[in-house]
Amino acid sequence: VNYNQLKTLFLSGIPNDNRGNVVINTKGQTNIVLSGSANLANFLADLPGVNYNFYLAGLGRPQPYEIPFWPNIIVNQISDPDTHDQALIRSINLINTQACPVINHPEAIKNTSRELIYQNLNGVDGLIVPKTTRFSPTNPQDVKREIDEQNFTYPVIFRKAGDHGGVSTSLINSEADIKKTLYQYALDGSAFYLTQFVDYVDSDDNYRKVRLIVVDGKAYLRHLIISDSWLIHSSSRKFMAENIKFDEEEKDYFIGYEEKIWPKIKHTISEVTARLELEYYGIDCDIAADGTILVFEMN
């Protein structure tokens, strides 16, 4: 196919709660930004050929699959099976009407929920995926029962399925801590995750989270964030801003990544990519000195 004539169909998903954000980019253009989707189309607007972003609905009435051309390739941007299961089903139905390659097939995305990542990647050499279960508690006793029946040991991480960025995430340190921790949650039968906490504190009493972006089996460094808390997100950069040496550490990490880090993790990343069957995905993790990857999130 001549790239100047390439017809690319991007698939985006409206979450089950039917919510999204409208933003204005630096060119003054209006873009729809949806949670749980990679939103690649917004950054690839200048691709040659014809590009079309098709939005697949979440819950609601049946949706006609009206596309203005037959695509040469389909790029699925939907990345969260917890919040977009209906959109994923619809994207699979649409793809089945086409006859072209698909990047990040929705069938593979369905296998990237936290508990399936644990089940499917367990045993990969050089990879630690903490035990994770999904359940729907209606009271604190349900949480205690899940901890006991699944043989978790304290502390454990409790979070609502589909939430990211540390939202609705708590650490339960003991049985006595359950009620005190869970008062803030509406335990209405919604899906939650329990994850075995693995302490990854470094010798300086700080924590380090690495974000990798894997494309075609090659892991690229996105950032290194350092914090005095185990729960690290973008807001943790405030801690780094107050400690200039950590900014320098991140810069040095970038400089040395290809030579010092990538050789230690490439075989693990290769096996993970083969199991996930994804062309691109992200990993939030800790990388030990020997290259062992402790997974926080992967999708």
Protein language model features and the residues they cover:
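Short, surface-exposed coil-to-beta transition loops
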Residues: 88, 207-209, 280-281
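Phosphate-binding site of ATP-dependent enzymes
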Residues: 170-260, 264-267
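Conserved metal-phosphate-binding beta-hairpin within the catalytic cores
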Residues: 250, 269-299
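Generic beta-strand structural signal
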Residues: 104, 214-215, 287
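Active-site nucleotide/adenylate-binding loops and adjacent lid/helix of ATP-dependent enzymes
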Residues: 5-20, 97-99, 107-208, 259
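Conserved N-proximal alpha/beta basic substrate-recognition cap immediately N-terminal to
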Residues: 14-145
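Short, solvent-exposed loop/turn segments at secondary-structure junctions
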Residues: 15-16, 60, 80-81, 109, ...
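Glycine-rich phosphate/pyrophosphate-binding beta-alpha loops
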Residues: 166, 228-230, 299
